[in-house]
């Protein structure tokens, strides 16, 4: 069963969440990730996680999953691109990030956007 990040309740679907993204956009991203059983968790980091985003800020996501490969990453990237969202999505696999500063940043400010 999927557990998805609880978002602010709002009667207007276009109201941004605390990540500065409409509820519908987050749901579409979560639904795309749910198509891949290898994705155990998706962590949002960067300006959208810290609350310092601008309307045009990208969406920084790193994926966690024991069996995730670069081929999965490519498929997910294509599926997210097909959503035609107005933001660039910077997608990575946490296990392949070599930059210790970036890993520390993700650990410190990362917010769970999706969890299987």
Label every model-predicted segment.
Residues 60-63:
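Short beta-strand->loop micro-motif that forms the acidic, two-metal-ion catalytic signature
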